[in-house]
């Protein structure tokens, strides 16, 4: 599975690093492009923009600091939604709210993709060691598809029901 990872901050950087260390093919992107180089040096590729990353990947993970930034990544110029289609999964691990996740998730569904919200618990230190807890809201079939990825970055992964 090819993974796009947008948001390489305190938590996102640790999660993306776990995926790279465990052999996943990962494209990375951050508003602060200086954060990308360490991941590229570790074997990741640099993504051009959310649309290109969605086109190139099966799974797009966003781990961003606010609902507004998530909306921009998904709906803005060169946003991920423009390339979302059947066979594409969007995993939202950002700091956001349930209404915004459901709103963007419905747009993903309308485009033919599959959304999953994956809030985490455990902080940066646990994210660095793959010891966080992940609470996944989505359809069971989508959960089953991404479970191998989620168990790479988290020790406890729980399917909590539908999106949001």
Predicted segments with their positions:
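A short acidic, helix-capping loop that chelates divalent metal ions and anchors anionic groups
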Residues: 35-36, 70, 125-129
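Rossmann-fold dinucleotide-binding core
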Residues: 8, 95-164
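Rossmann-fold NAD(P) dinucleotide-binding segment
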Residues: 50-115
